[in-house]
Regions:
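Bacterial Sec-exported substrate-binding components of ABC uptake systems
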Residues: 4-8, 18-61, 159-190, 252-256, ...
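Short helix-initiation/N-cap motifs at beta->coil->alpha
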Residues: 43-46, 94-105, 227-237
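A short, structured surface patch at a secondary-structure boundary
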Residues: 60-109
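Alpha-helical, coiled-coil/dimerization segments enriched in small aliphatic residues
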Residues: 83-86, 198-231
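Proline-aspartate-enriched helix->loop->beta-strand connector
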Residues: 104, 111-116, 132, 240, ...
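Charged, glycine-enriched surface loops/patches
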Residues: 124-161, 182, 260-279
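Structured C-terminal subdomain patch of bacterial secreted/periplasmic proteins
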Residues: 243-307
Length: 307
């Protein structure tokens, strides 16, 4: 009888230990997500992180990474409120919650299962406590690579490849139709900011991806050197002739920049030849699929009308 009692007691301790172990494992799975519900994603910086296999509530904290998700049928539940200043993306994200960059509490209230932001985001540690957070790096990942990555995140790799293929075919067709207007020609993308003039590199929206990567136009030599490892250069008004060539894209918020009234501007070859393409930043600032399609439409039309 005594032996039976001891056996039963040991059995109870064993079962209790097993139950405790199972509870801990389930608790751990609930907190971090079951391994069957997650996948490993490699970020631009090389770090591998776990993200949901099928994210349903995505928050995007930089406008550049919104358009591809919308294009693939995965409209974010929350987006950075900068999109209010951009008609193209604002129209595409109607119904999404507008979020301030530093308003972490509001971001948490959207109950995201995935957050997409940039490597520069200062709130990254706080965001990671809310949901798995992907950091994108525009210096390491151009718009095509970013489109592929976003397709991978939402399991739409085929849609990403198809968009890129169709996009490249459109640009090649444009290039042939434009002929001598773009062959061997130089072009500069300019914007006036409160800090002065900005001339952009080859991967910064505002038509750069189209005229450089798509149409094969070139940067003036000085601009090319200065933007080889940077997003932009900042020439003075007096230096404009060194940074501009056959064509100029002038990106504005609808205003007439003061520098366009100066002699320095009026004496530029592109200006004298009426080779200035005007872009409204409220439609054309970013380099996502939706914004790029809009930019192409505007740039192609203006180039065709030029002599």
């Amino acid at each position: 009888m005594k032996k039976l009692f001891i056996f039963c007691l040991c059995l109870l301790f064993f079962l209790a230990a097993c139950n405790s172990s199972e509870t801990k494992e389930k608790s751990s799975e609930t907190k971090s997500g079951s391994s069957s519900d997650t996948k490993v994603f490699k970020q631009d910086d090389g770090e591998k992180i776990k993200i949901p296999k099928d994210p349903k509530r995505i928050v995007v904290l930089h406008p550049t990474y919104i358009g591809a998700l919308v294009e693939f049928g995965h409209k974010p539940v929350g987006v950075i409120d900068f999109v209010k200043q951009n008609k193209t993306l604002s129209d595409a994200t109607k119904g999404a919650k507008m979020l301030g960059q530093n308003n972490v509490e509001d971001i948490a209230k959207t109950k995201p299962d995935l957050i997409i932001t940039t490597k520069e985001d200062k709130n990254i540690n706080k965001l990671k406590k809310i949901a798995p957070t992907v950091q994108m790096d525009a210096m390491k990942s151009d718009y095509k690579a970013a489109t592929k990555e976003l397709g991978e995140i939402v399991n739409e790799q085929d849609k990403a490849k198809k968009w890129i293929k169709n996009w490249e075919e459109k640009l090649e067709k444009d290039k042939k139709s434009l002929g001598n207007k773009v062959d061997g020609k130089t072009i500069t993308v300019l914007q006036s900011t409160p800090k002065g003039l900005t001339a952009f590199g080859k991967n910064y929206g505002r038509g750069t991806e189209i005229v450089y990567g798509g149409y094969g136009m070139m940067q003036p030599e000085k601009l090319e050197k200065e933007t080889k490892n940077a997003y932009m250069a900042t020439p003075s008004e007096e230096e404009l002739s060194d940074y501009t060539g056959d064509y100029i894209i002038l990106a504005t918020m609808g205003e007439t920049p003061q520098f366009t009234q100066t002699t320095n501007w009026k004496n530029l070859d592109a200006v004298k030849n009426n080779h200035v393409i005007e872009l409204d930043l409220q439609q054309t600032q970013y380099n996502d699929p939706i914004s790029l399609e809009k930019q192409r439409e505007i740039i192609l039309k203006q180039l065709k009308e030029m002599k």
